[in-house]
UniProtKB/Swiss-Prot annotation:
Keywords: Isomerase, Magnesium, Metal-binding, Phosphoprotein
NCBIfam families: glmM (TIGR01455), PRK10887.1 (NF008139)
Catalyses which reaction(s): alpha-D-glucosamine 1-phosphate = D-glucosamine 6-phosphate
Function: Catalyzes the conversion of glucosamine-6-phosphate to glucosamine-1-phosphate.
Organism whose genome encodes this protein: Aeromonas hydrophila subsp. hydrophila (strain ATCC 7966 / DSM 30187 / BCRC 13018 / CCUG 14551 / JCM 1027 / KCTC 2358 / NCIMB 9240 / NCTC 8049)
Keyword field contains Phosphoprotein: yes
Cofactor(s) recorded in Swiss-Prot or TrEMBL: Mg(2+)
One Pfam family here: PGM_PMM_IV
EC number: 5.4.2.10
Note describing how the cofactor binds: Binds 1 Mg(2+) ion per subunit.
Protein name: Phosphoglucosamine mutase
Modification comment: Activated by phosphorylation.
Gene3D superfamilies: Alpha-D-Glucose-1,6-Bisphosphate, subunit A, domain 3, Alpha-D-phosphohexomutase, C-terminal domain
Length: 444
């Protein structure tokens, strides 16, 4: 059955436009409450990032859950992985995150975690969608859910993050820049690294409701690179608005993406005898990652794009390390979902145990030039089915002669066609990507 509301990462859109409106979000809270109340514990955690619309949507969700008879535990600004972790430790029936991740402030979204801290199964999302088609009916007054705020959520999560860094190691003597993108990690990430001994220069830690992901954070790592060079820091880390993505910068200002982070973590796990199986990447993962892991004898598999699909494949194979080149890194030995802070701590562990700078650790992987072009399209159209597009793709693949890849896919969160071409020569793949993008544009 086709989904009406849930995309690859929950419900998302522009604030004030359906479905990100107060009335719909209240009904979504009610529908989720109706489904979840059948499963046991009648309490749900709610966290949010720093968007100004989070206040409005939090109140709407709270009202909907209360109408269904569930208790809402409000945590305020909290990274997505923190909600996943705290949902488990509070033994709640579910966790809800109000965030649009790396998108601008005027977007927002709602995503859910199940009691075990993983994304909701498809069948539960479909059950919530089915309830949304029914009229909202409030439970009896005596059965209404209450709401309460907890003040120590950030402290609990800080201690959890620190626990994923070996107790016999220290970040003493390390100078690092931490860019929180004016997002949900602003009051957490700097404390984690400072308390482990690092000298921290914090940027992107002054959210005003409108500046999330604006020229800072993992989607704009140039700001981090500039600060690392300016301060002569050893490295830098940048998170997105909800803290589930990580991008790093070494002391030369080189920007290290999710594929290179996966390589560093996997190589360290292999070296220390902790690697279980292989590594799961996505269809967008750089060929350089696959070849570098192959050289180390580490198996590599590609899942569909989206951290939920990476996690599904990791569980199917019993592997513990996976992620996306965008910086979603999942370390199942430590947590249940993508966690930017925890992933950064795994890289810092590798730096400490190998006694090598970040620049040296990443040098074992040589990335292929990869060009991504986004083409906006009208909803309801399918330009990927056009003969001209398919012919151009076939032509490009023939020219690459097995030393590169072409990938076209629809975004799961925006009306975009993503055209990716990868090969050995940057100008060649840039030209190829533009040729295909032009055919996609012409198709509608």
């Amino acid at each position: 059955m086709a989904r009406k509301y849930f995309g690859t990462d929950g419900v998302r859109g522009k604030v004030g436009e359906y479905p990100i409106t107060p009335d719909f979000v209240m009904k979504l809270g009610w529908a989720a409450g109706k489904v979840l109340s059948k499963k046991g514990t009648r309490k749900v955690l709610i966290g949010k990032d720093t968007r100004i619309s989070g206040y409005m949507l939090e109140s709407a969700l709270e009202a909907g859950l209360s109408a269904a008879g569930l208790k809402a535990i409000l945590m305020g600004p909290m990274p997505t992985p923190a909600v996943a972790y705290l949902t488990r430790t509070f033994r709640a029936e579910a966790g809800i995150v109000i965030s649009a991740s790396h998108n601008p402030y005027y977007d927002n979204g709602i995503k859910f975690f199940s009691a075990d801290g993983t994304k909701l199964p498809d069948e539960v999302e479909m059950a919530i969608e089915a309830e949304l088609d029914h009229e909202l009916k409030c439970v009896e007054s005596a059965e209404l859910g209450k709401a309460l705020r907890i003040d120590d959520a950030a402290g609990r999560y800080i201690e959890f993050c620190k626990s994923t860094f070996p107790s016999n190691l220290s970040l003493e003597g390390l100078k690092m820049v931490v860019d929180c993108g004016h997002g949900a990690t602003y009051h957490i990430a700097p404390s984690v690294f400072r308390e482990l001994g690092a000298e921290v220069i914090a940027i992107g830690c002054s959210p005003d409701g409108l500046n999330i992901n604006d020229g800072v954070g993992s989607t704009a790592p140039e700001a981090l690179a500039a600060k690392v060079l300016e301060c002569k820091a050893d490295l830098g880390v940048a998170f997105d608005g909800d803290g589930d993505r990580l991008v790093m910068v070494d002391n030369t200002g080189y920007i290290i993406d999710g594929d290179e982070i996966l390589y560093i973590i996997a190589r360290d796990a292999l070296r220390n005898g902790r690697l279980k199986g292989g590594v799961v990447g996505t269809l967008m993962a750089n060929m350089g990652l696959e070849l570098a892991l192959q050289t180390l004898g580490i198996p590599f598999a590609r899942a569909k794009v989206g951290d939920r699909y990476v996690l599904e494949m990791m569980n199917e194979k019993g592997w513990r390390i996976g992620g996306e080149n965008s910086g979603h890194i999942i370390c199942l030995d430590q947590t249940t979902t993508g966690d930017g802070i925890v992933a950064a701590l795994q890289v810092l562990t590798a730096i400490c145990t190998a006694e090598m700078p970040l620049a040296k650790l990443r040098s074992g992987m040589n990335k292929f030039p990869q060009v991504l072009v986004n083409v906006r399209f009208a909803e309801g159209r399918d330009p990927l089915a056009a003969d001209a597009v398919q012919q151009e793709v076939a032509k490009v693949e023939q020219e690459l002669a097995g030393r590169g890849r072409v990938l076209l896919r629809k975004s799961g969160t925006e009306p975009l066609i993503r055209v990716m071409v990868e090969g050995e020569h940057e100008q060649q793949v840039r030209d190829m990507a533009q040729r295909i993008a032009q055919q996609v544009e012409s198709a509608f």
